[in-house]
From Swiss-Prot:
Post-translational modification as stated in the protein's UniProt record: Phosphorylated on serine.
Oligomer and partners: Interacts with E3 RID-alpha and E3 CR1-alpha.
Job of this protein: Prevents infected cell apoptosis induced by the host immune system. Acts by down-regulating a number of cell surface receptors in the tumor necrosis factor (TNF) receptor superfamily, namely FAS, TNFRSF10A/TRAIL receptor 1, and TNFRSF10B/TRAIL receptor 2. Down-regulation of these death receptors protects adenovirus-infected cells from apoptosis induced by the death receptor ligands Fas ligand and TRAIL. RID complex also down-regulates certain tyrosine kinase cell surface receptors, especially the epidermal growth factor receptor (EGFR).
Annotated membrane topology: Single-pass type I membrane protein
Full protein name: Early 3 receptor internalization and degradation beta protein
One GO-annotated biological process of the protein: regulation of signal transduction
Length: 130
């Protein structure tokens, strides 16, 4: 995988050098002056001597190579969804919660007595003074 990345980088570095040696700079655009804005559309409407097929081929190769290069280096990047703990981060900021200190009863303090059950008189059950 590393060899293919190095090969693609070498192609990107060598491509401008090879193209500059084989083709001459376009001389027709030398007369296009950016200070004369009214002449720019007529100056750049001329037909190019380079075929459109070459332009599409070069753009397609560059898009393909940049896609392969991006896919090759993506696992080594530690950003975005590729981060180590990306799925553990909350999507919204967590509200600040102040922890309250719990009241701890002393160890040697006796517990409060349990509530006594209600008292029912025998006389109240029978309905009189028998």
């Amino acid at each position: 995988m590393k060899r293919s990345v190095i090969f693609v980088l070498l192609i990107f570095c060598a491509l401008p050098v090879l193209c500059s040696q084989t083709s001459a700079p376009p001389k027709r655009h030398i007369s296009c002056r950016f200070t004369q804005i009214w002449n720019i559309p007529s100056c750049y409407n001329k037909q190019s001597d380079l075929s459109e097929a070459w332009l599409y081929a070069i753009i397609s190769v560059m898009v393909f190579c940049s896609t392969i290069f991006a896919l090759a280096i993506y696992p080594y990047l530690d950003i975005g969804w590729n981060a180590i703990d990306a799925m553990n981060h909350p999507t919204f900021p967590v509200p600040a919660v102040i922890p309250l200190q719990q009241v701890i009863a002393p160890i040697n303090q006796p517990r409060p007595p349990s509530p006594t059950p209600t008292e029912i008189s025998y006389f109240n059950l029978t309905g009189g003074d028998d």
